[in-house]
Amino acid sequence: MLTQTTLEQYFRDLEMLVNVDSGQDAPEGIRRNAEFFRDAFDRMGWLTELQDIGPTGPCLVVRNREAEHYDLLLTGHLDTVFPKGTAARRPYREEENTAYGPGICDMKSGCLTMLYALQEVPAEVLEKLNILLIFQPDEEIGSIYSKELMCAWAEKCRVCLVFEAAVDAPSPLHCVQRKGMLRLGFRFYGRAGHAGSMLTNGAVSAISEMAYWISRIDTLVSREKNTTANVGLVRGGIGNNVVAAEAEMSGEIRFEFPEEAEKAKVLIRELYRHAEATGVRVERTLEGYEPPMNPTPQTLAYVDHLNTLEAQNGRTFSIRKRGGLSAANFLSQHLPICVDGFGPAGEKAHSEDEYMLMDSVAPSIRLTAQAICALAKEKG
């Protein structure tokens, strides 16, 4: 039974977590918060392991027992996007039903909900299930150190709940579909020369070639398929009277359908051929790929099941597509059921206005505990 005393302790713990800098320049803060969760699960008698996987801080893996396969994976990230000193400058604060602070909904409250929900589940229920939790230290930089480890664990799991924040709405919005992302970055090398003599001096503009690439990349935008293309950073040249010898651009393609990423790759190969024909050398400076999270039939059936559980609480389990990335993008490729947005409701992540709705905490904890109990009942 979730009591007021328990909720008060939740908010005290949340204040402590939020007031610890946890950006990529503060791995000691990420470690400190990981140790908080490790110690809490140690007291519960669970198996815990802090794994040093990179310079961002440790990844915490928690299990209720050793097992070949796990019924449930709960996961969240301990890092934020904010630089060291942010927590001191704008610490945790509460205003009526709203709590503010760096990383409060993205996603320290979600990580804490995982712990508190499991504390609400009766021991006899936990005995029936094999449960795994992963607290990652590097989601905000693309999970570059933790992804391989997390995917290996996901292969052993049936259901995954990701505790990114639910979207603030009359009925909090969860997520089973996220766009994938293809990251692009290129440096262009032309040939410098006086702009007034470029027709005869052999000068080749790196900026002109880059501009051609941008115009072609923009053709990938599709309202019908909800594909976006954005070149967000460009630079180049040294003066108006000098044909630019160098230029650089970076951007990304976001897509629901994997074939849209393949279409982009075909275009990039074509653009390389164009650059070669115009005398511009192109070097790739950024690359990265995240698959889209698209719901399996099993996931959609599980959403119906969660809606049935929420109906017992007088609520609905609502879902909405999201354009942003999370660990669910890659985890969903490795197991049959994956649902994101299981944390308390909030908005405005990555900004000074980031907030969490305090009255969404108890429903988030209760639903998670109910979902765990239902898994045990299903297992028999």
Indicate residue ranges for each PLM-predicted region.
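Active-site-adjacent substrate-binding region
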Residues: 212-222, 293-339
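Active-site metal-coordination/substrate-binding segment of hydrolases
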Residues: 69-135, 141, 352, 357-363
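Acidic/His- and Gly-rich active-site-bordering loop/insert found
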Residues: 2-102, 126, 310
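Short beta-strand segments
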Residues: 75-76, 134-136, 161-164, 187-189, ...
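Zn-dependent metallopeptidase/amidohydrolase metal-coordination segment
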Residues: 315-378
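A structural preference for short, hydrophobic beta-strand core positions in alpha/beta folds
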Residues: 50-51, 284-287, 319-321
